[in-house]
Amino acid sequence: MFKSYDYCLNLGGFANVSQEVNDVRLAYDICPVNTVLNFYANIKGLPYDDNGKIASQHPVNTKLLNELNALSFYDKRPPKSLGVEWVNHTILPIIESYNISTEEKIATFTEHCAQQIGKSLNNTKTSTNSLDVLVTGGGAFNGWLIDRISNHCNSKLHLPDDELI
């Protein structure tokens, strides 16, 4: 079923991507997603940012975005893996060092995710043709995040029906 896609992108607590190479599935983590976004949505009394409504209606803090994007993890070559410890010891302290609203933190981190995922998909591209990417996981329900990822990559994102997501 998944062989018709160049990549499978899972947007769960962390974004991870997998592909089949010589009948072997290779996978790696790209960045935190719902682990961080849900943390800040919970502060607002919400389980998550429903369809990216908060992120889409608030500004991105460019300074924070640049600091997040400059983290050395993003320069490592795959395979690479992330854990909640890295979020707690690296990501959250950076975000919390900014005196900005929770909504702005959500907007900025959503953009950070989109940029890192787009960069990762663009860097793995092996031909001049657009890649077909199957998107699954809870983050696939975040329309704003999907729009922002599409803005930062040359791949075609495919969202299956809700049951598969």
Name these PLM-found stretches.
Residues 7-11, 26-30, 159-160:
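General beta-strand structural signal in soluble alpha/beta enzymes
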Residues 1-6:
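Conserved phosphate-binding catalytic cores of ATP/NTP-utilizing and phosphoryl-transfer enzymes
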Residues 13, 138-140, 162:
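Active-site metal-binding loops of divalent metal-dependent hydrolases
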Residues 130-149:
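Glycine-rich phosphate-binding loops at beta-strand->alpha-helix junctions
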Residues 15-20, 38-39:
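Short beta-strand scaffold segments in enzyme catalytic cores
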Residues 26-114:
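Conserved ATP-utilizing enzyme core subdomain
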Residues 150-165:
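Conserved phosphate-binding/catalytic loops in two-lobed NTP-binding clefts
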Residues 99, 119-130:
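Phosphate/pyrophosphate-binding loops at sites that engage ATP/ADP/AMP, CoA/4′-phosphopantetheine
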